């Protein structure tokens, strides 16, 4: 790995780079390549998204959404991200096709400071349009727009958790009445079974904003003991 945010700490750092555990994680930007990603029509990525000299994935112009070639069910996803001023992006997971649209739950990424009047469930690290924070004690730890932040998503069985810079923001269950009610109140209410599927693709969204990702690692948790 080229770099890791300081808050990872020695325990997590050792976990991610030790020979034994490294085999459990897949580097989704391995060898500075986009071979593990594709466009929605299955084509290779040829414009918009590019790997920079420092190994980061940079969306500088319109490049369309990127879908992982593989599907993931239960997983532990780590990533670093940086967004432009007034920017909006996100990482979707368990993505599947609904009619002509690829939809899934989303770890929202945006310049929150530019949208003070936006609904809270659109803030960074929310489950986009469904949940803001799962408890009042949860709080976001912001960094400057010129710095990378660190995101983490653990999806295991019915439990969904989002972290931002080491702080837990979302802790929800997709089999709860609270979740069902949130879907009914969201833009996805017309999509039958939205959020109920337990496997699908990852998606890096293109909303017309400049965004950067690096150190994108995923570990499959299917059949594994519950991660605390």
Task: Describe every region a protein language model picked out.
Residues 7-16:
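Bacterial N-terminal signal peptides
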Residues 1-6:
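Positively charged n-region of N-terminal signal peptides that target proteins for export
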Residues 22-228:
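Carbohydrate-interacting regions of secretory-pathway proteins
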């Amino acid at each position: 790995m080229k770099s890791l945010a300081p808050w990872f700490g020695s325990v997590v750092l050792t976990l991610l780079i030790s020979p034994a555990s490294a085999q459990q994680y897949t580097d989704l930007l391995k060898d500075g390549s986009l071979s593990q990603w594709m466009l929605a029509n299955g084509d290779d990525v040829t414009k918009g998204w590019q790997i920079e000299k420092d190994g980061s994935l940079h969306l500088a112009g319109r490049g369309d959404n990127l879908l992982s070639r593989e599907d993931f069910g239960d997983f532990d996803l780590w990533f670093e991200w940086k967004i432009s001023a007034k920017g909006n992006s996100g990482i979707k997971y368990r993505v599947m096709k609904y009619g002509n649209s690829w939809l899934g739950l989303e770890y929202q990424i945006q310049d929150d400071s530019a949208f003070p009047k936006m609904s809270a469930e659109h803030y960074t690290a929310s489950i986009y349009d469904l949940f803001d924070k799962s408890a009042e004690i949860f709080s976001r730890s912001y960094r400057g727009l010129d710095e990378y932040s660190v995101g983490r998503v653990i999806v295991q069985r019915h439990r969904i958790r989002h972290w931002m810079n080491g702080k837990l923001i979302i802790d929800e269950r997709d089999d709860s009445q609270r979740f069902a009610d949130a879907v009914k109140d969201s833009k996805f209410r017309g999509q039958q079974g939205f959020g109920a599927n337990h496997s699908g693709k990852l998606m890096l969204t293109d909303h017309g904003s400049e965004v950067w990702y690096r150190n994108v690692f995923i570990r499959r948790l299917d059949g594994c003991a519950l991660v605390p």
